[in-house]
């Protein structure tokens, strides 16, 4: 649910910026473009940390699965295998969520870059269209 609220707010922010760029509204456009570099850097750092955590979870998972395969009795293995299946699904869900966030970030970057180029090409005089 939180992701949907975040996506809706991000979409609304891009729509508002697009309208400001169309009006050559420097007061609204410039702060958004100026903050973009920091926002992108933070996204990259957060994505790296999440991917690092996913990789660590996968390595731990693989080690435990290997140990179970090598040492488990048939009855115990069944219960432990079920836990591993659920944990594997959780890790894959995290990876899919991160991949979706990266995809959306790429689309957002493309939109921001296109709006910035439009603004620079059409609003270079320093006068706002009102």
Spans of model-derived segments:
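Classic N-terminal secretory signal peptides
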Residues: 1-12
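Intrinsic disorder/low-complexity segments enriched in polar/small residues
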Residues: 45, 52-53, 71, 82, ...
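Extended alpha-helical coiled-coil "stalk/arm" regions
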Residues: 47-83
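Short, flexible helical or helix-coil boundary motifs
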Residues: 24, 28, 52, 62, ...
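Immediate post-signal-peptide N-terminus of mature secreted/exported proteins
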Residues: 10-59
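C-terminal amphipathic alpha-helix
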Residues: 28, 32, 89-130
């Amino acid at each position: 649910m939180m992701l949907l609220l975040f996506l809706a707010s991000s979409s609304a922010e891009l729509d508002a910026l697009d309208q400001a760029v169309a009006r050559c509204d420097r007061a609204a456009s410039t702060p958004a473009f100026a903050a973009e570099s920091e926002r992108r850097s933070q996204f990259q750092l957060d994505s790296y940390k999440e991917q690092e955590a996913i990789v660590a979870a996968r390595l731990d998972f693989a080690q435990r699965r290997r140990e179970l395969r090598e040492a488990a009795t048939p009855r115990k293995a069944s219960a432990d295998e079920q836990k591993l299946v659920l944990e594997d699904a959780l890790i894959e869900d995290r990876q899919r969520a991160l991949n979706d966030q990266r995809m959306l970030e790429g689309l957002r970057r493309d939109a921001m870059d296109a709006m910035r180029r439009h603004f620079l090409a059409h609003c270079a005089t320093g006068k706002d269209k009102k």
